[in-house]
Amino acid sequence: MKKANAWSLALIPCLGLWLGAAPVWGATAPPLSEVRVFKVESARCTETIPERAQSTQMCTHRGPTKVSVMEVGLGNNPMGRFNGAELNGQRTPVCQVGSISEACSGAGTLMGYIYVFDLNVQAQGWFEYSNTSINGPRNTLKTLLNIR
């Protein structure tokens, strides 16, 4: 019989602490099923973006601009870009609590994320967001929006 290595034994409590600190959502992770831009905010205006829209319509966005993306399901490779340049985004988990979707606060089932990306828009350009599902069918979803 092979003796256990001290290093491998030391990993067990570390893994237990790591797993114990992870949130328990109580359900299988839903596959990524939708990504879309739902809001663009700048000093000139805030506009709600309808489904399947290809461009902003209400105003010409310039300067500091926030782009909000809704992601239904869970992915593991979120990527936001404006005119090809990678962006950093803030994400907020969204949970289903009964029939209501809300920011997670320890109750409900994790159903996706809201990402907010900060841009500095100098001229019209394309915002792109993509992510790949963490489980079957491991599909990659993408949304594009022309920001005028």
Predicted feature descriptions by range:
Residues 1-11:
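Bacterial N-terminal signal peptides that target proteins for export
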Residues 10-20:
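Bacterial N-terminal signal peptides
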Residues 24-62:
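Short, compositionally biased P/S/T/A/G/V-rich stretches that sit at domain boundaries
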Residues 57, 61-75:
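Aromatic/hydrophobic beta-strand junction motif of beta-rich domains
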Residues 71-99:
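Extended low-complexity, serine/threonine- and proline-enriched intrinsically disordered segments
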Residues 100-117:
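Aromatic sugar-binding surface patches on proteins
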Residues 116-147:
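Short, exposed beta-strand-loop hairpins at the edges of beta-sheets
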